[in-house]
Amino acid sequence: PLKAKYSIGAQIDLMKAHGISFLIMLVKYLGGEVKFTIDQVGLDMIDDAASSTDAADTITTWDARPSQGEPWLWKKVEILDRFEEGSNNIFEKTKRGVATFIHCGNNMARVIRQLDKFKPRGGVTNTPTGPMVIGTLDGRTVVQNPFKSTNYYTMGFRGPSYLYAGFIYCPYIPLFTTPTLITADLMAQKGFLSSAGFKVINAGLFCEGQISNLGGGYQTA
């Protein structure tokens, strides 16, 4: 649950000076914070599953340093082989799923954005907060998360039904808001509540990988 407190005077001043409804802005903002929290809880649970003993095999670490004289243009495409390795690890573990998404930290996203096959998501007009879908790579949804360890990434399979699920999010109360309460000192209060269930069903549909030495110069013999 979240609780917002504000003065009626501030609400009136904002409307008179700028024609902006403070209440509408508040509901949109705190509703976004609730969604952000739900997303982060789910992603953290998926990451924990991907690093567990029940997950598919860990992907071989990719050393991002080019060999002496090797152009970065060629070096960066090596990461595609790691993604195929991760997808095969999931298929080998489960015999039924391949990687359909990549959840990555900022350094991993930095590399992905430079790949020719990356297709950025269009139409993003809102200021990003927390994890966000940045596009697709070879048909896999790419999620960049500033709260994830910058050099780590998780690959996973999103199935078409519960029978193929690795993780389930079940909203019970999507978003509930209380009526606005105004006290005698002209202070207003409004509460927000959301409730959901989260469950890892099959950790084998996830695997973890990492990169190292991004921007670390050339490899030495």
Which positions does each model-derived feature cover?
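Gly/Pro-rich turn-and-neighbor structural signature
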Residues: 57-85, 89
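Sequence/fold signature of self-assembling virion shell proteins
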Residues: 1-17, 22-28, 73, 77-79, ...
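Structural signal for hydrophobic packing residues in well-ordered secondary-structure cores
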Residues: 31-38, 42, 194
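Short, glycine/acidic-rich hinge or "gate" loops at secondary-structure transitions
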Residues: 22, 39-63
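Secondary-structure transition/capping motifs at alpha-helix termini
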Residues: 36-41, 90-97, 221
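Beta-edge loop/turn motif
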Residues: 100-105
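Basic side chains
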Residues: 3-5, 35, 65
